[in-house]
Amino acid sequence: MSLAKTSIIWFRRDLRINDHPALLAAIESAEQVLPLFILDKKQIDEAGEKLLAYMGQSLRALDESLGNRLHIIEGDQVEVLKELIAAHGVEEVHISAEYERFGAERDARVEAAGIKLVRTGSPYAVTPGRVLKPSDATPYKVYTPFYRGWRTHGYRAPAVTPKKFNVVQPTDKFRAFPDFPMPAGVNVIEAGEAAALKRFKEFTKNGLDSYDENRNFASIDGTSKMSTYLKFGEIHPRTLLENLGESKAHDTFRKEIAWREFYADVLFNNPMTDIDYYAPKFKEMRYDKPGKQFKAWCEGKTGYPFVDAAMRQLLLEGWMHNRTRMVVASFLVKDLHLEWQIGERFFADHLVDYDVASNAHGWQWTAGCGTDASPYYRIFNPIEQGKRFDENGDYIRRYVPELAHLSASEIHEPWLFLDGYSKGYPERVVDHATERLESLARLQEIKADKPLGPHA
């Protein structure tokens, strides 16, 4: 059977060339490939500045990989696709499947307009919805058995993209690269597939074998920093998994990849839980309205050094250590008594690695209302967390210069020392011990002995 003349590869959350099944399918189906990225105005209006600026850099890197032939334009997806299909006689539009509400609804609208979409692969090693309980073919609600099922299911080997393939030369109209400036003073990681592969190579050489020991310590560069690259699809999780062995450290890293896949699976099976409670009873709890204390949390001025260092890291880098994400989330929900969605939206505005499923369900885990949730009575102590995971205070000093003059024994509780507030560090907005008891009292009111999922 003869090949079609041109196929479109429509890039979305997969800004890479290697290990890209949809791109490979497009190459194999036609004589030449038209690479396309469509800027969506609604998505742009809702996205954070840092994320957009990073995306702009990533698109430039992808364009370079394609020999400066990426077609890029802002517009309605149906209109743009129909124009290119007509101009180039395209029969098929190839995509990586998407499972979050926005992407799924967009693709359904495109297909309803009569455009044929060919789905190959997804942003995950195992597509959401495929890992099911062998007993009754229902989705898992708890991570540990999901992980066992996920490993048993397995995943394909990375797809091999040809080194050379024919790419359509775009007209000037389709070279509308966006100008998304990075906010002043913000320093994010380098964007693009090459940067992702380089970072992962460095991690496998210098960090992977000690990952289980170092991953929780905020002052150590002990994590892979792959979350942003996975969010934009600059690297595929299979590429990471392909390099893992069976040691404890490697398995710990594998389990972190599986957490991302678990949350994607949970959201796929419960599509409104990106904005709504997985455990509905938590809607009944008494919550406060955001005010001055929330503003202090947003600015990293709560008076709790470990919390403030984390929030300032987020503002400066568009990224935050996973340990501190849990600590600041617990502080917002259980010390300030605000609903998790408020913090989730703030993260969405500032995280470069913002992932709908991981973010929403990470917040719900900490709040105690999610699947496989942290027990409702677990309330992170922001002082003890700092002492445990930033013992010498190096992380705090890096982001909270008002406390840099304090010793390791002083820096976690500056209010106990005469010199603690001498450089302008703010006083505590709340007393943790008091708010912990208040949080437990509110939880007791809804009798949250064991949060139940919506399908329990």
What are these regions (language model features)?
Residues 1-158, 249, 358, 433, ...:
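Trp/Phe/Arg-rich N-terminal binding region typifying the photolyase-homology
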Residues 221-402, 408:
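Active-site-proximal binding-pocket segments
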